[in-house]
Design a protein with these regions (language model features):
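C-terminal beta-strand-rich structural cap/linker in extracellular carbohydrate-active enzymes
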Residues: 401-453
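Bacterial N-terminal signal peptides that target proteins for export
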Residues: 1-9
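Aromatic/acidic polysaccharide-binding cleft in carbohydrate-active enzymes
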Residues: 255-325, 339-345
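Boundary/entry segment of secreted carbohydrate-active catalytic domains
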Residues: 22-62
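Noncatalytic carbohydrate-binding groove/subsite architecture in carbohydrate-active enzymes
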Residues: 157-276, 280-285
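Conserved, mostly hydrophobic/aromatic
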Residues: 57, 129, 140, 168, ...
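Substrate-binding cleft and catalytic face of glycoside hydrolase catalytic domains
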Residues: 52-214
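Carbohydrate-binding surface patches
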Residues: 342-390
Length: 453
């Protein structure tokens, strides 16, 4: 595909930014497993977490680990989750506390509390934990993935959830008037619709989504597919909220770097992390994103669940960690301005403002093509720009290029870049810059199967 975009056409194709981000800072972070399993080196995790510029963490205090004997609530401080909560709170971060999972003494073989006794038991547990985390937890999330077990994805089951919610929310608010209430995490769009039909919006301050696509199979497990899912979920939410958006937190999302049918290489995990971070702020209803999870759960290459982490079990950073560390400032503090239309839905150029600079985040979703773009700077004085791939060191480039492959004369006001899957970031004064040319050419990223080593 080859086409030239004129100055007039390019201006017409600029999409306006979405206003109204709200006063709350965007929350970017990851999930931990300190609350129940106490897994990981807390200090090593938190040091790397803070160095990456993350400001949100999520963990749980499961019911059965608080009410050890029926009727006896005891908050055993294991020293892990408490240090995480205190450090996060001390740095102005956001802690999301999960209240979750059935207690065998109340629920028997059921996976959810349904009887009056079980609901009252859950309410006592929830208000107790809320009191213990008062002033430090920004959110109490009532349950994690209610819809994840057989039979719990139905409308009837979600009505059971809203019944529990109606009972427990007043108790939580009484225990900590400042805390906000977050819904259980919807894992698929039809499950989200059942949750909304059941009346969840009457009781919560924010919705939680777990929009995983990593399990959907090749071609449907990409960030491009995730973005389409998020757009559908937004439309569903508006359908049940009088046409208006509702605050959403993506409290789990990730791709496992594992040797499994639904696994990915560490390089692909990093690429998807970068595409995810660069595009999430184009969805104004999303107020926060937490990667699942910060640390690998184990050293088991053939187990997907053990390999979602940004760091290994011994705290060695993975490539995706460096992507998070590099892009965290842009995601947290940047202002999304517009998406620059390229004429190709698989070629993305996003315009941000960050600390007085313009930032372009640019990549393509084509699995087997390169895209060359040409930018022209019409300013009288053209300052150098910073250029880097996400997670990599930046280089400085002066404006001016010669298209020697076509034997064209030098253009003092132009720069050309090749876009592939890893986002390329251009930073500087781009106020008079426009896209003047885009060309996509075949360029496979992998060897044919019959030629792979």
């Amino acid at each position: 595909m080859k086409h030239i975009i004129s100055k007039l056409a390019a201006a017409a194709l600029l999409l306006p930014g979405i206003a109204g981000w709200g006063a709350e800072p965007f929350r970017l972070g990851a999930c931990f497993h300190f609350g129940s399993s106490a897994s990981g080196d807390v200090e090593a995790n938190l040091n790397l977490f803070e160095q990456a510029g993350l400001n949100a963490g999520r963990d749980e205090r499961s019911w059965r680990f608080v009410e050890w004997e029926k009727g006896e609530l005891r908050y055993f401080r294991n020293g892990h989750i408490e240090r995480m909560i205190s450090r996060l709170h001390g740095r102005g971060g956001c802690y999301i506390n999960i209240l979750c999972y059935a207690h065998p003494a109340y629920c028997g073989g059921e996976r959810i509390p349904k009887t009056p006794e079980a609901i009252e038991g859950f309410c006592r547990y929830a208000e107790f934990v809320t009191g213990e985390t008062r002033g430090k937890a920004a959110f109490q999330q009532v349950w994690n993935e209610w819809d994840a077990h057989p039979g719990t994805d139905t409308l009837e089951s979600h009505r059971d959830y809203v019944k529990l919610l109606a009972a427990v929310v007043p108790r939580i608010r009484a225990a900590d008037p400042s805390v906000k209430i977050m819904s259980t995490s919807a894992t698929m769009d039809y499950k989200l619709e059942n949750l909304l039909k059941a009346g969840v919006l009457e009781h919560v301050d924010a919705l939680s989504l777990h929009p995983y696509v990593s399990w959907r199979g090749r071609g449907k497990d990409t960030v491009e597919s995730w973005y389409g899912l998020m757009q559908r979920m937004d439309r569903t939410i508006r359908k049940y909220n009088r046409g208006k958006p509702f605050p959403v937190y993506i409290t789990e999302i990730g791709w496992p770097a594992a040797i499994t049918a639904n696994g990915f290489t560490e390089e692909t995990q990093a690429v998807y992390a970068a595409q995810l971070l660069c595009s999430v702020r184009t969805l104004p209803f999303v107020k926060g994103l937490l990667w699942y999870d910060f640390q690998d759960d184990h050293v088991r290459p053939g187990e997907a669940e053990a390999n979602f982490g940004l760091i290994r079990a011994d705290a060695t950073p993975k490539p995706a960690y460096y992507v998070f560390a590099d892009l965290s400032e842009l995601v947290r503090d940047g202002e999304f301005v517009r998406r620059i239309e390229t004429g190709d839905p698989k070629v993305w150029i996003l315009h941000y403002r960050l600390n007085g600079d313009d930032v372009y985040a640019m990549w393509n979703y084509h699995p087997d093509r390169n895209t060359q773009i040409v930018l022209r700077n019409e300013a009288e004085t053209r300052a150098p720009v910073s250029v880097r791939h996400a997670g990599r060191p930046a280089v400085t480039m002066e404006w001016g290029r010669r298209d020697w492959l076509r034997q064209k004369p030098r253009q003092a006001d132009e720069l050309a870049f090749t876009l592939r899957d890893m986002p390329l970031l251009l930073r500087g004064d781009l106020s008079r810059v426009r896209l003047v040319r885009i060309e996509t050419v075949p360029f496979p990223r992998e060897l044919p199967i019959n030629k792979q080593p």
